[in-house]
Amino acid sequence: MGKTFVYRFDQGHKDMRDLLGGKGANLAEMTAIGLPVPQGFTITTEACNDYYEKDGQVSSLVLDQIDQALLELEKVQGKVLGSDDNPLLVSVRSGAVFSMPGMMDTILNLGLNDKSVLGLASSTQNERFAYDSYRRFIQMFSDVAMEIPKYKFEAVLDRIKEAKGYQSDTDLTTDDLMAIVAEYKSIYQSEMGKAFPQDPREQLLLAIKAVFRSWNNPRARIYRQLNDISDQLGTAVTIQSMVFGNMGADSGTGVAFTRNPATGEAVLFGEYLINAQGEDVVAGIRTPQSIATLEKEMPAIYDEFIAITQLLEKHYRDMQDVEFTIEKGKLYMLQTRNGKRTAKAAIKIAVDSVKEGLISKEEAILRIEPSQLDQLLHPTFDSKACQEALCLAKGLPASPGAASGRVYFHAEDVVAHAKQGEPCLLVRQETSPEDIEGMVKATGILTARGGMTSHAAVVARGMGKTCVAGCSQLRVNEAAKTVDVDGRQIHEGDYLSIDGSTGRVYLGELAMTSVTVDDTYTTFMSWVDEARDMLVRTNADNPRDAQKGIDFGAEGIGLCRTEHMFFEEDRIPAVREMILADGLDDRLKALDKLLPFQRQDFYEIFKVLNGRACTIRLLDPPLHEFLPHEEKAIKDLAEQLGYPLDYLHKRIADLEEFNPMLGHRGCRLAITYPEIYQMQVKAIAQGAIKALQEGYEVRPEIMVPLISSAKELAMLRLLIEQTMQEELTAADQELAYTIGTMIEIPRACVTADDIAQYADFFSFGTNDLTQMGFGFSRDDAGKFLGEYVDRGIFDKDPFQTFDQKGIGRLFSTAVALGRLAKPELKLGICGEHGGDPAAIAFCHSQGLTYVSCSPFRVPLARLAAAQAAIKASGYSLTQDK
């Protein structure tokens, strides 16, 4: 006996999703537990894959099994497909393993033709109903299976309704419907070059093939790519005998959720229509009634429906989204599936389900997608406002949240207008460190260039600012203060709105929905913290971000970038003076001006942390990044420092590098200019001493960036220890501190055993490690990475999703060698991947001590770390069933 490609509903169960798809498996399960389900059968996902292997042909084996299942269905129903006496009608639905948009829509009433419509009219004693069903079928079949534009049919309907003064489809008479059927068949003949198929088996085969084809349509393929769903799964096809909600006042159809999908409240939520078919509810042609009113209209049906929905929720142990039809006073369940819900509802349902004894805490934790917490903790646009707004362009969703504001193209303009209370969007080709003040004051940031790890993206995430980056459809003219997009020109002061969670850019100002956390969220996150065994720190460069990270549950700072402290308006002149200094004496004078600023910064951060660890990265970027690039700013600097303009131009040119990311930066600056790191270490020591003397606990971890050789770290460790000791001795103070390094160069990974001899900890800088491991410049990779993903060379952009196969091997090598040389070595990650759930799971598997991410991603990282720990313990969702 060959493979089984077709299963009756009474032959399957809910754990056969891979074979029967979500829809087919759930219909089989509802049948098994005795619910009133119109019977039918499911053609498996394997039949879909077989169809593609046979170049778009349904094999004879599959056809034979369909015919056999159809015969059995006809016997059960006491009706025959295509009969002109008492015809069997069926619906055809796609049913992938995972629910996804883009798959083929439902076809209802399949089996109707010029003869069987008479049989339907006779058997139901309702001619109008029969022709209404026929016109619906022709339109659906033509649109969904044969891809004839829907508007061609809608135009006929609208014309007749307008001519006769009808308000609703229900006003159409039998004669009207007969005329519409005739016109619909003419449209089909004209579009397809042949008559509308009258053989029900031909109709069925065409519909099945259309479902299989829809598996590979562009929308479905893109959705699978975005959601990591395999192209090899295929879709099932569900064939189900029709029940009719449009047979009069004792019939109807509706959709309901067993809990409120927006809030999670444990009340039935849904709507229905009397005398209607399923698509009427979705199409919005008539206004549905709340499910609560069904209790008055049909009390017995309502009581039965309540009992069924409660049974389904207990059975599936999750909120269900159900479709139902009432035919002549009898209730039928057409579908159930786990309902989609907002982040707020997801957490409430998970917590309530634990309290109700439906699931365990572990399952509650595994049920919440970490990315949902991003949605919960950032403001979002009102969903209706988004639907009504004009979307101008789409870039990269670089930092989540929603922001509306007036467009300004220069940081100083943002600062000036923000002071007057205006909401401002900073719009740039790409941002640079000079824009930092404008970025702080802006409600959101929009750039035409740059990727998910560009300057704008990284800084925005750190500040919790909404950012859309790399929006290549924008033509930004910073000089003219205009941006051209989609045939429009936006001027300075015009309103735009950006959605950092989707990357969409909208015209005008959109209404927003703010989200606040409640006791349910607090309870859920307490379970998360109980479950995880890996620490979560935050990346923070100032006391404000440090406090924000702690408020979100961070257990310290995993990356404090000292260079970000240099860009404040009152200190950048001293930084530039230090960089442009002629010799050591001038450089030391400039550094003396910077020391008090850095000392105060560290003191303030240590106070906020009060005993929590603080990993401080010493100066990393190349010096030219701190210098101005626009002519006006260069002239102002020349006047400020008393330098001739020509001399200043020459000094700036001398500091320019062909490849600055691989140039004179990081520890290399300290080897050539040790006084820079000496000043920073003094500031750390003095800030720590002041905090200690005021009764605070201090735990500094000093981190040296860009180490590629153990000798570099040996030399700089000595410099740091000597400088620290001088300061501590002078103050007669003791302080426990550690010294470590960033692991961000491939050579450092493969010589980690040597480097570990001089390090108390390693922190993986995955941005640079990815950049150097692939040989990509992350600022230029946006030009080709999209194409790499589209063509299947990469599954994902490696700057967004950690590359476990390649960069992960370098990472694993460094972990193994480092711990071999020094078993007590602490390990962390502080690159942008520190907030990526897949990367966090990988870090857990490698035994890392902590992950560190931007403040707003801390809750996400806490949840991802808990999920990794639960899965590593061998727990699976099936244990709760």
Regions found by a protein language model. Give the residues of each.
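Nucleotide/phosphate-binding sheet-loop regions of phosphoryl- and nucleotidyl-transfer enzymes
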Residues: 1-389, 397, 415, 422-425, ...
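Short beta->alpha connector loops at strand-helix junctions that form conserved
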Residues: 41, 448-450, 469-472, 560, ...
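Conserved alpha/beta-domain cores
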Residues: 93-94, 517, 527-881
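Structural motif
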Residues: 238, 408, 425-427, 446, ...
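Extended, non-globular alpha-helical segments
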Residues: 395-434, 485-523
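Intrinsically disordered, low-complexity regulatory segments
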Residues: 410, 473-474, 522-525, 535, ...
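A short, small-residue-rich loop immediately preceding and capping a beta-strand
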Residues: 443-449, 467, 828
